[in-house]
From Swiss-Prot, chain B:
Ranges of the DNA-binding region feature: 140-206
UniProtKB keywords: DNA-binding, Nucleus, Transcription, Transcription regulation
Primary localisation category: nucleus
GO BP term (any one): negative regulation of DNA-templated transcription
Protein name, as recorded: Probable WRKY transcription factor 40
Annotated localization: Nucleus
Coiled-coil regions listed: none
GO cellular component: nucleus
Highest classification ranks of the organism: Eukaryota, Viridiplantae, Streptophyta, Embryophyta, Tracheophyta
Protein's job: Transcription factor. Interacts specifically with the W box (5'-(T)TGAC[CT]-3'), a frequently occurring elicitor-responsive cis-acting element.
Length: 39, 302
């Protein structure tokens, strides 16, 4: 039961990490677009 | 016996041990799961930090860009025309609003500033509106007023209150000069051109070489429409300027009102000269003065 709980937690954090990575990618994209515009 | 005994040898493969070992290897130990959880949590933390940093950078950059755009908009407004519509907030990326959490810059302050500025400009323009009346020949049907400046006509329209069309001109002496004028014939007297000037010239008056004889005679209105600005501007001209009350001009519609003023002056001078020379007292006094002067000169030379 403890292992199941751990596994669930790992899955949740992994899913969150995936979302965070996507968001980071988009922010980076926007940042560089803006940066190019400024230059 | 040996064979029998040998037949008693345990030949079992002891597979159960292997099965047990395999089952243990399939289920990772709890410690491994904990390690994995720690790893992903650390990764999560790192990603969050990076995202925060990136968002901060993005916000700073965005703010700079907005400031730059606002500044350029303001300068544009100052120079030319009303501003373009601000970009609608709906067009802003929802993600950037949500993730970046940046407070969208309120456009109300800018609009207020713009409105105040526009109002100020309008009042300034209102203050500098002046109306000048020019007398023209009755046969002259053009709407050209020779006031010493160069003008570019950019429009003409017919108004309800006046049958003669109204022409619009813009000062063409300097590209930065924003003075405009409207010229229309007076309703009361068709020989009078009414020029309404808006603004003040930001340049000196162009050469007056051609202006000595070519300028229209301007009549400053006796009413409130004529402002000191107009009077000063016209007074700088070298042409004879006459101030005629429009009430008089209404009454005087005879051809005498259209006599050229330099001619009148010349006539007056001639009349004065002839009347003086005919006067014997004047000639005697003049002769005495001249001889007295000559006598004095001779006396000092000796």
């Amino acid at each position: 039961e403890k292992r199941n709980m751990l596994q669930d937690e790992i899955n949740r954090v992994n899913s969150e990490n995936k979302k965070l990575t996507e968001m980071l990618a988009r922010v980076c994209e926007k940042y560089y677009a803006l940066n190019n515009l400024m230059e | 016996m040996d064979q029998y005994s040998s037949s008693l040898v345990d030949t079992s493969l002891d597979l159960t041990i292997g099965v047990t070992r395999m089952r243990v290897e399939e289920d990772p130990p709890t410690s491994a799961l904990v390690e994995e959880l720690n790893r992903v949590s650390a990764e999560n933390k790192k990603l969050s930090e990076m995202l925060t940093l990136m968002c901060d950078n993005y916000n700073v950059l965005r703010k700079q860009l907005m400031e730059y755009v606002n500044k350029s908009n303001i300068t544009e407004r100052d120079q030319i025309s009303p501003p373009k519509k601000r970009k609608s907030p709906a067009r802003e990326d929802a993600f950037s609003c949500a993730v970046i959490g940046g407070v969208s810059e309120s456009s109300s302050t800018d609009q207020d500033e713009y409105l105040c500025k526009k109002q100020r400009e309008e009042t300034v323009v209102k203050e500098k509106v002046s109306r000048v009346y020019y007398k023209t020949e009755a046969s002259d049907t053009t709407l050209v007023v020779k006031d010493g400046y160069q003008w570019r006509k950019y429009g003409q329209k017919v108004t309800r209150d006046n049958p003669s069309p109204r022409a619009y001109f813009k000062c063409a002496c300097a590209p930065s000069c924003s003075v405009k004028k409207k010229v229309q014939r007076s309703v009361e007297d068709q020989s009078v051109l009414v020029a309404t000037y808006e603004g003040e010239h930001n340049h000196p008056m162009p050469s007056q070489i051609d202006s000595n004889n070519g300028l229209n005679r301007h009549i400053s209105h006796g009413g409130s429409a004529s402002t000191p600005v107009a009077a000063n501007r016209r007074s700088s001209l070298t042409v004879p300027v006459t101030t005629v009350d429009m009430i008089e001009s209404k009454k005087v519609t005879s051809p005498t009102s259209r006599i050229d003023f330099p001619q009148v002056q010349k006539l007056l001078v001639e009349q004065m000269a002839s009347s003086l020379t005919k006067d014997p007292n004047f000639t005697a006094a003049l002769a005495a003065a001249v001889t007295g002067k000559l006598y004095q000169q001779n006396h000092t030379e000796k």
